[in-house]
Structure formats: structure tokens, C-alpha cells
């Protein structure tokens, strides 16, 4: 079993974008930003424990950080790992349920 401290560090937060919203409405899928070294098993365990829902599957991808310039200095944004978490039928996770 994965320890509780690690599970809290795996999920960084929900990813809110047009594509993520469309996935949530149509496919019962929630998109999270996760730790770059998190595994699919850790992500599944963290979502099931923290939100008390059943997860069907997890797909992950890493987006490379953009190169940015400020004057003569050049830097690079950090890479971000995203997790598309597909919930089982009948399960629901609503982050903005109380907002009106």
C-alpha cells in the first residue's frame, strides 16, 4: 500500500481548460496536474482515497515546458504531467458543485 503522505503529494490540482471541460461533460473524465514522477497506480489510489470515487482507468502525458525570454535572458518553464482519470459508470466528481 502506498503511504498517505505520498498520496497527498501526487495530485497537484485539477486542470481547467476547454478540452478538460469537454472531457468531463462527455466522457466522465477528470483531468489533474500530477507530480512528474507519479505512476498510474499512485494516481488511481490518490483519486480513489481523496475523492471517494471508483476509477476505471488512468492515462498520462507529459507536456514539455515552453522556452521563454525576458530581455537577453532565456529560460524554460517546467514540464507538466497531466493525468486523464476515467471514472466508472455512475461515479461523479464535481469541483464547482456549490457555485452558483
Curated annotation (Swiss-Prot):
GO terms for cellular component: ribonucleoprotein complex; ribosome. GO terms for molecular function: rRNA binding; structural constituent of ribosome. GO terms for biological process: translation. It comes from the Bacteria. Pfam families: Ribosomal_L23 (PF00276). InterPro entries: Nucleotide-bd_a/b_plait_sf, Ribosomal_uL23-like, Ribosomal_uL23/eL15/eS24_sf. Keywords: Ribonucleoprotein, Ribosomal protein, RNA-binding, rRNA-binding. Belongs to the universal ribosomal protein uL23 family. HAMAP family: Ribosomal_uL23_B. Part of the 50S ribosomal subunit. Contacts protein L29, and trigger factor when it is bound to the ribosome. One of the early assembly proteins it binds 23S rRNA. One of the proteins that surrounds the polypeptide exit tunnel on the outside of the ribosome. Forms the main docking site for trigger factor binding to the ribosome. This is Large ribosomal subunit protein uL23. It comes from Aliivibrio fischeri (strain ATCC 700601 / ES114). The gene is rplW.
